[in-house]
Curated annotation (Swiss-Prot):
Biased composition (Low complexity): 533-543
Major location (coarse): membrane
Family: Belongs to the TDA7 family.
Bilayer topology: Single-pass membrane protein
Organism domain of life: Eukaryota
TM regions (residue ranges): 489-509
Record-level GO cellular component terms: fungal biofilm matrix; vacuolar membrane
Places the protein is found: Vacuole membrane
The protein's name: Topoisomerase I damage affected protein 7
Species of the source: Candida glabrata (strain ATCC 2001 / BCRC 20586 / JCM 3761 / NBRC 0622 / NRRL Y-65 / CBS 138) (Yeast)
Protein keywords: Glycoprotein, Membrane, Transmembrane, Transmembrane helix, Vacuole
Glycosylated residue positions: 4, 70, 203, 242, 249, 282, 315, 333, 375, 478
Length: 629
């Protein structure tokens, strides 16, 4: 599985090692192609410590043997192929040993690397030295040691040259400059200077066959070589040799490699069983790809990912023109043995430096003949628009619709899958696929399913993934536990407040209903009846004695001396009292007898005077019936 990723901050190597030990998820060795391989064998991820290339002679051909050491299973895998003797120096051996990923401090990973190869005439040996500077924060390791020895004779004159190594498949990796020098053994008459050899080559005095037979070779394979090691079971190795004529920048410079034709170089590679050769000419360059398969049959799955050529949010602000990205194939077998893959990219048949312009946007070349050497250097490329490249892998199908890998470690089970994320920020948005590992406890019952759609998240999640903060299961557990506590507290507080409010409201409403006073009012029909009765009731003032009309005064008693005239001897008070007594008394109630009034009575009824006045029977003031009552 090849996956796009980058690191912009130096992650803690201790946390990375602990995560590798706990979850058995070992990130592969990150090559210059900005790719990370993730192992399909989570239970037993292989970790390759070193890779060696042995070159031996057999029947005028060189046998290139590649050996990979697996420090996990303490096993090694060896693959051999035959190459013509003209490609490599006579009897040389090269070892490429990148250090283990766990032992490399992140801060010491070099940004640029310089390899110097010098030859010693007396000892007939080639000395290799390497210098590197570190400021690039990622898992890209350029540490390598290349040793080469030669058994052939070294002429008195040695050619020292310098060239710039191509950054490989990743254009955004800082440029790596490699300088080397090698001896030349040839049947051609010795020359005194580099310029004379250059003139011989430019005048075509040396034929192509003469060049091949004279073994005029330079370690061109070191000019632009990259070793791609996947430490976690991706089981693929790529050794790229870029044969380019960057040794020359003018028509008078050395043009040794330009005499080697494409057809002669292609014929030097012998087809192995189950191998394929791909030739894709591009102008003056050809690409040869030899892919050897294991003897045991294995099921292959292919997946394709489109990755940007620039690391998002990296410290570098420069863009590099990317190389034509080859298709990297890898396969696994039942014994997790390593398969080798050889990709010879950029075979140049031109003696000019035009091929180097394909790899770099701008370059500055300088040539000097001091101490018989040529030095080439190139400035930092200019900024161009980014492009995308497609990398195909046949190792394991872990795309969005791919399978989910599981591994049991202790009391936990781990699920690993590839999830596509849409990272959004304030100024940029990009889409990337990230490997995700989810852990569950074996004692708990759970159901796990991989998200099927693209997850949109912010830049904070992406930075946490790069720094390794998401790799700690304990930290995630603590965060989730704290989040659950906070959420529970908030929900409990809200629910408690609602319950208290409901209780208070219930008692308040109940008390209000109990003490509520209803207002009384008369029915309209009854009000009309009462009003009518008040006006027409004859007995309304029956018991109101103050408004009752007093009865009339009874007539005065008979006085024999003077009828109708009160005696003079009676005072005013007696007159009034008698009058009052007569007024409110009936005749029948007086003490006098009816004989006393018989003489003076002129009518059937004698009406007494009112207020001492004699009433007239002709015009009575009161009605007859009223008087009787």
């Amino acid at each position: 599985m090849i996956h796009n990723s980058s690191y912009t901050e130096a992650a803690d190597i201790k946390s990375l090692s602990s995560f590798i030990e706990e979850s058995s998820r070992v990130p592969d060795y990150i090559s210059e192609s900005n790719n990370i391989g993730w192992s399909s064998n989570i239970n037993n991820p292989p970790l390759f410590e070193s890779s060696s290339f042995d070159i031996t002679t057999q029947n005028d051909n060189w046998i290139l043997t590649e050996t990979m050491q697996n420090i996990t299973t303490e096993s090694s895998s060896t693959f051999s192929r035959s190459v013509a003797s003209s490609v490599f120096p006579s009897s040389s051996q090269a070892f490429v040993s990148p250090p283990s990923i766990i032992d490399i401090p992140i801060s010491s990973i070099p940004e640029s690397s310089s390899i110097s190869i010098s030859s010693d005439v007396l000892s007939s040996a080639i000395t290799v030295s390497q210098t590197s500077s570190s400021s690039y924060s990622s898992l890209i390791s350029s540490y390598s040691t290349i040793q080469s020895t030669s058994s052939s004779s070294i002429s008195e004159n040695e050619i020292s040259s310098s060239s710039r190594i191509s950054p490989g498949l990743l254009s955004s990796v800082p440029s790596i400059t490699t300088s080397f020098s090698s001896g030349i053994s040839s049947s051609v008459s010795p020359t005194s200077s580099l310029q004379q050899i250059a003139e011989q080559s430019s005048n075509s005095s040396l034929a192509e066959n003469d060049l091949l037979s004279s073994s005029l070779t330079i370690l061109s394979s070191v000019l632009s070589s990259s070793v791609l090691l996947h430490n976690s079971g991706v089981s693929s190795s790529s050794f790229t040799d870029n044969f380019s004529s960057t040794l020359t920048n003018s028509s008078n410079s050395l043009a040794i490699l330009s005499s080697i034709s494409e057809s002669s170089l292609i014929n030097t590679i012998t087809d192995l069983p189950s191998s394929s050769v791909l030739l894709s000419p591009n102008n003056s360059e050809s690409s040869i790809k030899v892919s050897s398969a294991s003897s045991s049959s294995s099921r292959r799955k292919a997946s394709t990912y489109t990755t940007p050529s620039r690391i998002p949010f990296s410290n570098s602000s420069e863009w590099y023109t990317p190389l034509p990205t080859p298709s990297i194939s890898s396969s696994t077998n039942d014994t997790s043995s390593l398969l080798s893959e050889l990709a010879l990219i950029g075979i140049s048949s031109s003696s000019s430096s035009s091929s180097s312009s394909q790899f770099y946007t701008s370059s500055t070349s300088s040539s000097s003949l001091v101490s018989s050497s040529e030095n080439y250097s190139s400035s930092q490329p200019t900024t161009i628009e980014p492009i995308t490249s497609t990398i195909s892998s046949s190792y394991s199908d872990l795309s969005n619709d791919g399978e989910i890998l599981s591994s049991t470690l202790g009391k936990s089970v781990y699920y690993s899958y590839i999830q596509t994320f849409d990272i959004t920020a304030s100024t940029t948005t990009f889409e990337t696929a990230l490997p995700i590992v989810t852990a569950f406890n074996l004692k708990d019952s759970y159901t796990f399913s991989k998200p099927s759609s693209i997850i949109t998240t912010d830049l904070h999640f992406y930075k946490d993934w790069l720094s390794g903060a998401l790799d700690s299961n304990e930290e995630n557990g603590n965060k989730s536990k704290n989040a659950g506590t906070i959420a529970g507290s908030v929900v409990g507080s809200v629910v408690g407040l609602l319950v208290c409010t409901l209780i208070v409201w219930y008692f308040y409403i109940r008390k209000r209903r109990r003490n509520q006073k209803w207002k009384s009012f008369e029915v309209p029909s009854r009000s009309k009846d009462v009003e009518y009765n008040n006006n027409d009731n004859p007995f309304n003032n029956e018991f109101d004695f103050q408004h009752r009309v007093p009865p009339p005064l009874p007539p005065q008693r008979k006085n024999h001396n003077s009828i109708g005239v009160p005696p003079s001897s009676m005072g005013l008070s007696n007159t009034r009292s008698a009058d009052y007594h007569m007024r409110f008394s009936y005749i029948s109630s007086s003490t006098d007898s009816s004989d006393d009034y018989s003489d003076s009575m002129q009518s059937a009824l004698h009406i007494g005077s009112d207020s001492g006045r004699e009433r007239s029977n002709d015009v009575p003031e009161m009605g007859y019936l009223r008087e009787i009552i």
